[in-house]
């Protein structure tokens, strides 16, 4: 039985940086900030639609979950508790920045039934991270990943982006090598989509940012799928989901509504 997620989107409120590639409200398709009642409503609805809640995680995505105000983070976590304790959902999955992980935060997550933590690494090149205004370093990613794994109660997920400003084939393969060395259970691979209203969009319009060839990115992602399979790492996402909002805001990059299928067709 495969696992599934019930997603609760937490907008840009938790992100301390506006990364060069990010227009989070475009990606999530919403500006609404969810509160406890929203979490309960979404979970209640899911109970009527999901076949096996024991294989379903309540997932807080869309922003940097551990960077939101502490009271708000606890509000959302507490709202989900009854569905785990009483209704036997599998647990809670969150995504966050690597520089917002600490023992204090992990203690809170552990005590509130968080079972999976995904870190937005994006690149394992400090040059690429700085060029794309990420606001953290490779060392931050490595430190956070190791700390998460040391608890023994969290599944580690890592997210990487392909084709960022200042990246190339060599940096992508270096990023993969360093991510694989951290032994995550899951990875998400997002080829860059250049969105209107972002710094990356401005660099693209000016000609300063020249993306890699689309076919080259497909080849790289195809290779990463093969390597992940060899290592037993589950690629749970490859490419942004098909979205009318994304398509309307897209200036360029590596978007296809069936991007994963394109890559799998190369193997």
Predicted feature locations:
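Generic structural hydrophobic/aromatic packing signal, biased to beta-strands
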Residues: 8, 80, 94, 235-238
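Glycine-rich phosphate/diphosphate-binding loops that line cofactor/substrate pockets in enzymes
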Residues: 51-54
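Canonical Radical SAM [4Fe-4S] cluster-binding loop centered on the CxxxCxxC motif
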Residues: 1-38
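Conserved non-cysteine loop/helix-boundary elements of the Radical SAM core domain that shape
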Residues: 27-41, 47-49, 62-192, 196-215
